[in-house]
C-alpha cells in the first residue's frame, strides 16, 4: 500500500473521518479534508495510535467476501442444474418432429446421466455435430429451435469474483499551460486524473460541471491549486498581423539594445535645393541623372560622419509627389526643412511643416542659398515663426542652420546638429533579432522581377531570410546597398534594395522576417487572402457622417481639419471659429489652411492625417475629386460660415440631419387643359414614363426649362381619386398654387429618399 485517503482509512479501522483527522492533528500532520492522501509512514503512526493493522483486516475481509460469494454461486449453480434437468425431462415427452430432433433429444437425455464436470464439453460437441450435419446436406438444413428456458442450448459460465486491483495513477505534472479556457476532460487529461474526480472537486467548490463544459481561468487555478500544480495561461499572438511584431520591440531588454543611425527626411519647396543638399552631403551627382532636375522617386542613402552613420530619405518636393512625402514622414526620426533664403516660405514649405507635425517628427531648418546676394535669413525665420517654428536664437526650440548646398558651406554644422538631435532622442534598436521595417519604394523590373527598397528599422536583414512584405512573401535572394554594392546583411536604419518577392508590394508596407519559410508562406498567403476578401480594407477614413460613431467607440481623440477658402481673411476667421468648438472627448485640430482651390496635395495630406477637408467658396479641381474618391477623403463645401461650424458641431454630437436624395419616378405629358371655377386648371395628362403618385413632388417643365416646382393637389382617373397612375394611362392633375399649365408641358414627378449614411 503506497497512499490511502483519509475516509478510506477511517472505514478500514471502523472510525469516522473526523476521528482520524483529530488523530492526525495530534500527530502534527495537517490535512485539509477527508479526501486528503496519507503516506505509508503516516498510516503506520495511525495504526499504532488505533492499535490496528488495516492491511491485514482488509485482506481477511476480502477472503471472507470471496468465500461467501463462491458459496452463493455454488448454491445458485445447483438450483440451475436441477431446473434444467426438469425442463429436459419434460422436453422428451413431446412428439418427435424428425430424426434430427430425435437424435438431439436422445443426446440430451444421455447428457443428463453424466456428471456435472462433462456437461459443457458434451454440449459443445453436440453443437459441432449439428453444424457438421447441416454442412453435409449442402446447407439446406435448418438449426433446431431451442427448447423453452434453455436460451439457445448454451450454458453461461459462473463468473468468479476476484478482488479489484487498484490502478496506479500517474504522477501529477509540475506545471500545466492553457489558452483562454479548458474543458473538464482536457483539464483531467493534463492533470493525469479521471474526469469524474475533477467533477467531484468542482462540486465540492460549488461548481456544477459536465465533462465537456468549459472552465474559466479561476476554476482552473482553483483545481490546480488543490493538486499543488502550477498554472500558466498562454496568450496567443496573431502572427499574421505584422503590427504586433513592431509592438513587441518595446518589450525588449535594454541590455540587448544598441545605438542606431538616425533616419532623416529632407523636405521643402520645389527648387529650394533639397537634392543639391543631399548631393553635397554624399559628394555625388544625383541631380544630374534625373529628368528635369526633379527627383522622380524616393531614394534612400546612408552617409558617414566621423564614426557615425546617418540615413537620408530624399523625399520629392514637387506637388505631384505629395503622397510619397507623406509616406516618407512616417518612417523618419528627423526632418530637415530646406528653405531658400532668397525665396522664403512657399505653399509646399507649409505643407511639409504640416506633414512633419502630423507625424510628430522634430524639424531642423536648413536655410539654403545663403551665398546669393538677395539672401534674407531673418525674413525666413520671421515667416517660419508664424507656423510655429521659433529659432533658438529667438527663445524657441527649432534649430536653424544657414547653409549653401551648392558651395558646400555649413554642411558639417548641419550634420553635427542631426547627430546632436539623434543623441538626445536616444535612438536604439536590437540588431540580434529578426529584421522588420518599412518599404520605401517598389517596382517590377524586367530582368530581376519584383524589386523593393526596404528600410530596416529593427534587427538585421540577411540574404536568404524568409520575409513577408505587406500582402506578399518570398526569400531575400540578393541585397544591394545605396552605393550599388551587394551586401550579405543590413542592420538597423540601413536602406537596401532586395529581390526575391513573389509580387510587388506597395510603398509604405511593413515587412517582417520569420524563422522558417513555411511560416512566412502561411502568413503571406493568409494576408493575401484577407486582402482579397476585404478588397484592400484600410482604416476607415473619418467623415462627418461616421464621426460620432468613431467617437463613441473611442477611436477618435482628435478631429483633424484642412481649411481652404477663397481669401486668407476668411480662412483665418473660419479657423478661429472652428477652434472654439468644444465637445467633450474630441479636440479640433487644424493641420493645414490655405487660400485657393482644393488641390490634390490637400487630399493627399488629408489621407495621410485622416482629416476632413472643408472648402469655403472654393471647389476641388478634377485631380482632387478623383484623389478624394480613391482615398475616401470627406470634402465639405459651404458658402456660409455659421453652417460650417453648425455642421461640424452637430456631427461631433451625433445630431446630423439625415441626407435625402431626389429620385425621379415618372413623367406625364399635358395633352389638354380644363379650367374649373373654385378648382383651377386641370391638366389632362398622359403618363409617358414610370408613374405619378399622389404624394410625389412635381416640377413643370416647358421647353426644357423648369418653370415651377411644387406639390400635387389632386390626382384623378374618371372622377375617382387614385394613389398612383402608371405608364400608358391618362389622368387628371392639379398642382397646388399653380394654374399656368399649357398643352405640351411636361410634369415630372419625383420623391425624396433618405440616403443611409455610411
Curated annotation (Swiss-Prot):
The gene is infB. Belongs to the TRAFAC class translation factor GTPase superfamily. Classic translation factor GTPase family. IF-2 subfamily. One of its GO terms (cellular component) is cytosol. Residues 55-168 are annotated as: Disordered. This is Translation initiation factor IF-2. Residues 268-275 are annotated as: G1. The lineage of its organism: Bacteria, Bacillati, Bacillota, Bacilli, Bacillales. Pfam families: EF-G_D2 (PF22042), GTP_EFTU (PF00009), IF-2 (PF11987), IF2_N (PF04760). Residues 368-371 are annotated as: G4. Keywords: Cytoplasm, GTP-binding, Initiation factor, Nucleotide-binding, Protein biosynthesis. It comes from Lysinibacillus sphaericus (strain C3-41). Residues 314-317 are annotated as: G3.
Amino acid at each position: 500500500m503506497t497512499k490511502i485517503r483519509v475516509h478510506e482509512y477511517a472505514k478500514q479501522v471502523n472510525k469516522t473521518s473526523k476521528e482520524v483527522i483529530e488523530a492526525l492533528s495530534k500527530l502534527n500532520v495537517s490535512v485539509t479534508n477527508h479526501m486528503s492522501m496519507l503516506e505509508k509512514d503516516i498510516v503506520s503512526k495511525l495504526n499504532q495510535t488505533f492499535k490496528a493493522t488495516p492491511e491485514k483486516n482488509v485482506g481477511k475481509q476480502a477472503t471472507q467476501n470471496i468465500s461467501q460469494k463462491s458459496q452463493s454461486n455454488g448454491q445458485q449453480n445447483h438450483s440451475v442444474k436441477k431446473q434444467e434437468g426438469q425442463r429436459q425431462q419434460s422436453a422428451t415427452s413431446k412428439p418427435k418432429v424428425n430424426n434430427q430432433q430425435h437424435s438431439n433429444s436422445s443426446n440430451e437425455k444421455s447428457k443428463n446421466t453424466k456428471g456435472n464436470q462433462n456437461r459443457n464439453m458434451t454440449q459443445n460437441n453436440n453443437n459441432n455435430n449439428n453444424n457438421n450435419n447441416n454442412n453435409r446436406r449442402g446447407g439446406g438444413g435448418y438449426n433446431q429451435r431451442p427448447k423453452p428456458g434453455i436460451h439457445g442450448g448454451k450454458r453461461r459460465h459462473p463468473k468468479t469474483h476476484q478482488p479489484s486491483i487498484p490502478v496506479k495513477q500517474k504522477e501529477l505534472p509540475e506545471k500545466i499551460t492553457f489558452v483562454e479556457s479548458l474543458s473538464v476532460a482536457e483539464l483531467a487529461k493534463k492533470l493525469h486524473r479521471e474526469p469524474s474526480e475533477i467533477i467531484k472537486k468542482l462540486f465540492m467548490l460549488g461548481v456544477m460541471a459536465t465533462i465537456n463544459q468549459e472552465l474559466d481561468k479561476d476554476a482552473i487555478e482553483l483545481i490546480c491549486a488543490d493538486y499543488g500544480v502550477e498554472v500558466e495561461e498562454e496568450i496567443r499572438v496573431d502572427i499574421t498581423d505584422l503590427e504586433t511584431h513592431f509592438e513587441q520591440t518595446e518589450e525588449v531588454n535594454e541590455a540587448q539594445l544598441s545605438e542606431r543611425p538616425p533616419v532623416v527626411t529632407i523636405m521643402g519647396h520645389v527648387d529650394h535645393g533639397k537634392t543639391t543638399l543631399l548631393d553635397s552631403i554624399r559628394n555625388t551627382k544625383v541631380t544630374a541623372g534625373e529628368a528635369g532636375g526633379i527627383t522622380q522617386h524616393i531614394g534612400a542613402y546612408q552617409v558617414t560622419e566621423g564614426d557615425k552613420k546617418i540615413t537620408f530619405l530624399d523625399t520629392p518636393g514637387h506637388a505631384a509627389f505629395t503622397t510619397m512625402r507623406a509616406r516618407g514622414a512616417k518612417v523618419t526620426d528627423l526632418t530637415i526643412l530646406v528653405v531658400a533664403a532668397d525665396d522664403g516660405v512657399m505653399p509646399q514649405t507649409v505643407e511639409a511643416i504640416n506633414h512633419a507635425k502630423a507625424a510628430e517628427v522634430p524639424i531642423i531648418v536648413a536655410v539654403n542659398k545663403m551665398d546669393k546676394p538677395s539672401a534674407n535669413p531673418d525674413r525666413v525665420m520671421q515667416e517660419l515663426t508664424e507656423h510655429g517654428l521659433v529659432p533658438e536664437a529667438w527663445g524657441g526650440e527649432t534649430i536653424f542652420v544657414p547653409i549653401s548646398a551648392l558651395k558646400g558651406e555649413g554642411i558639417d554644422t548641419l550634420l553635427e546638429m542631426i547627430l546632436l538631435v539623434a543623441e538626445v532622442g536616444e535612438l536604439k534598436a536590437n540588431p540580434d533579432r529578426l529584421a522588420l521595417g518599412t518599404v520605401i519604394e517598389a517596382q517590377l523590373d524586367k530582368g530581376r522581377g519584383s524589386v523593393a527598397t526596404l528600410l530596416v528599422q529593427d534587427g538585421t536583414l540577411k540574404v536568404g531570410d524568409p520575409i513577408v512584405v505587406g500582402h506578399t512573401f518570398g526569400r531575400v535572394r540578393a541585397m544591394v546597398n545605396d552605393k550599388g554594392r551587394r551586401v550579405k546583411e543590413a542592420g538597423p536604419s540601413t536602406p537596401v534594395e532586395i529581390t526575391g518577392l513573389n509580387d510587388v508590394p506597395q510603398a509604405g508596407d511593413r515587412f517582417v522576417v520569420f524563422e522558417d519559410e513555411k511560416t512566412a508562406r502561411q502568413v503571406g498567403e493568409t494576408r493575401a487572402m484577407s486582402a482579397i476578401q476585404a478588397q484592400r480594407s484600410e482604416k476607415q477614413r473619418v467623415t462627418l457622417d461616421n464621426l460620432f460613431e468613431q467617437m463613441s467607440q473611442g477611436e477618435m481623440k482628435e478631429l483633424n481639419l484642412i481649411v481652404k477658402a477663397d481669401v486668407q481673411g476668411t480662412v483665418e476667421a473660419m479657423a478661429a471659429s472652428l477652434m472654439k468648438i468644444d465637445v467633450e472627448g474630441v479636440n479640433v485640430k487644424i493641420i493645414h489652411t490655405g487660400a485657393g482651390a482644393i488641390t490634390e496635395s490637400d487630399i493627399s495630406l488629408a489621407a495621410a492625417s485622416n482629416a476632413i477637408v472643408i472648402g469655403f467658396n472654393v471647389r476641388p479641381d478634377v485631380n482632387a475629386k478623383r484623389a478624394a474618391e480613391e482615398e475616401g477623403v470627406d470634402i465639405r463645401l459651404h458658402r456660409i460660415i455659421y453652417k460650417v461650424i453648425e455642421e461640424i458641431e452637430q456631427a461631433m454630437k451625433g445630431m446630423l440631419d439625415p441626407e435625402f436624395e431626389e429620385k425621379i419616378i415618372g413623367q406625364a405629358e399635358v395633352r389638354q387643359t380644363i379650367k374649373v371655377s373654385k378648382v383651377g386648371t386641370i391638366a389632362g395628362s398622359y403618363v409617358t414614363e414610370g408613374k405619378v403618385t399622389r404624394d410625389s413632388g412635381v416640377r413643370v417643365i416647358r421647353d426644357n426649362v423648369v418653370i415651377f416646382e411644387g406639390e400635387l393637389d389632386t390626382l384623378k382617373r374618371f372622377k375617382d381619386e387614385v394613389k398612383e397612375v402608371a405608364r400608358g394611362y391618362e389622368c387628371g392633375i392639379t398642382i397646388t398654387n399653380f394654374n399656368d399649365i399649357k398643352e405640351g408641358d411636361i410634369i415630372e414627378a419625383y420623391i425624396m429618399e433618405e440616403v443611409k449614411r455610411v
